[in-house]
């Protein structure tokens, strides 16, 4: 019976020690990512910026600083109308923030941006695929995006339902008016 007590004590000791060790490693990793992110933000030499960005997003891909860098890069590329490269960055962000221990907020932002860009590029099936995770979503904008993608693939009946869901959930009258225009546009083609 002494063996069992010693075994339990050892297991608990190793578990607690392992937990604190992993937390320390995680803390050090976040601190290193923070330094890289801050350096990336202030560096003006393009080659240095790119090297810092690659280091941050490849070696610290599961940190919030890497997610922020990818979000900023993807958004900047989209503003410059470099949609193909932008969507690649958002796919990387989606992959890095996905999963059980991922960041669902960042993942949702990445998916929304992928869908928006896919629709702009005419890749409606890709938009639907990336939004599939949100099949029961309560967000009005997600319903609107699904409606846009469904319209693009010619499924006007489902698009109309998505637009109606968006219309019901939007609180802002300007957004409601925009969705109402989309609904009216679909109804004129019936």
Question: Where on the chain are the PLM-derived regions?
Answer:
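TPR/TPR-like (Sel1-like) alpha-helical repeat modules
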Residues: 90-95, 136, 156-174, 184
């Amino acid at each position: 019976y002494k063996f069992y007590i010693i075994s339990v004590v050892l297991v608990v000791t190793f578990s607690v020690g392992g937990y604190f060790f992993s937390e320390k490693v995680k803390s050090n990793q976040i601190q290193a990512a923070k330094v890289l992110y801050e350096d990336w933000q202030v560096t003006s030499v393009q080659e240095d910026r790119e090297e810092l960005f690659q280091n941050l997003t490849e070696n610290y891909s599961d940190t919030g600083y890497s997610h922020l860098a990818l979000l900023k890069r993807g958004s900047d590329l989209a503003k410059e109308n470099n949609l193909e490269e932008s969507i690649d960055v958002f796919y990387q962000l989606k992959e890095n923030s996905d999963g059980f221990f991922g960041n669902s907020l960042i993942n949702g932002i990445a998916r929304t941006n992928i869908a928006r860009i896919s629709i702009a590029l005419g890749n409606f099936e890709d938009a639907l695929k990336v939004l599939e995770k949100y099949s029961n979503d309560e967000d009005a904008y997600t319903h609107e995006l699904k409606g846009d993608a469904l319209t693009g693939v010619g499924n006007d009946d489902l698009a109309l339902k998505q637009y109606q869901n968006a219309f019901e959930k939007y609180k802002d009258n300007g957004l409601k008016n925009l969705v109402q225009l989309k609904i009216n546009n679909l109804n004129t083609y019936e």
